[in-house]
């Protein structure tokens, strides 16, 4: 018997009309990545946000205070909304070509959290003190591993960095963060945690953080073997 399935781009919105109902973050974001088959029909969930929060928690980076969000694409919506729901002050740094998209994201977040403090700036103008910097761009992803979305100086007063990129294990951005003494968390942790949360929905099984950390390491080792020889 099928307990459920995972859904990915480009089907996260397309499956919604097939759902009996949406739960939690799936309802908020109108985006489904996990479907549970129940006696009452198909129920849509979104575990991307859960994976993100778990990754931050296990990496020692609280989602609080002043947050710099780089980019405003699909995964950026999840990060922006989670930061707003946590009461963070958001500085969204984007390319000039993405200003309109960033404004649309801000409007979406403001509808969810009307009182949110949300500023949009140019990526090359980002500066200041941040409790957390989140990279929601693909910059630094394999094979362009020598690239970073921001210069090292931007991280001088940043306490923690989360990079959604998971290949390579340690992006240029994360290397710079470590050099500045900041906590550095890669995207593989979010990927594995969202899968673990889907298993919890289907089977009711809770996962020990140490067990998940072990799976993260196994996934990173296999990725390095395949891509980096």
Regions found by a protein language model. Give the residues of each.
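Short, charged/polar "capping" segments at the starts of alpha-helices
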Residues: 14, 97-104, 168-172
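Adenosine-phosphate binding glycine-rich loop
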Residues: 160, 164-229
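Phosphate/diphosphate ligand-binding glycine-rich loop within oxidoreductases
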Residues: 1-60, 170
